[in-house]
């Protein structure tokens, strides 16, 4: 075997090892990757039962129902579509109707989103980029969503009021 053939064999072997390593990493990450969807995206796409994703939107007013023990059901809306959500656990303190929420879980066969994690909007200026984009696209965006309260990070000096 010539020197050139050995070099090509080494490069080919290294390429095979690299492809196998990338394949193993992607296979291991498949279970931990969670995609974000809005209710409209869920209704338009055929997301199969059992597929994990994050559902983001606003808790629809009047939809919150507390059941036995820690069972809670509510609806998440983005203004264009609504998805029913079932959750068993302790809700965040800031969770309420009309507020932003992100729930992580999967759809069941009846089309109910079974959440195992619920995150509430943590301040009045936070809105996930995907939810903001969806609201803008559907024409439900309000300009006051972008206004920051005085003293908030990124608020203008004029909005902060007089300094001491």
From Swiss-Prot:
UniProt topology in membrane: Single-pass type II membrane protein
TM segment ranges: 8-28
GO biological process: cytochrome complex assembly
Biased composition annotated in UniProt, kind: Basic and acidic residues: 137-149
Main location: membrane
Sequence ranges on the Cytoplasmic membrane side: 1-7
Parts of the chain on the Periplasmic side: 29-164
Cellular component GO terms, alphabetical: plasma membrane
Binding site for heme: 122, 126
Membership in a protein family: Belongs to the CcmE/CycJ family.
Protein name according to UniProt: Cytochrome c-type biogenesis protein CcmE
Organism in which the protein naturally occurs: Rhodopseudomonas palustris (strain BisB5)
Highest classification ranks of the organism: Bacteria, Pseudomonadati, Pseudomonadota, Alphaproteobacteria, Hyphomicrobiales
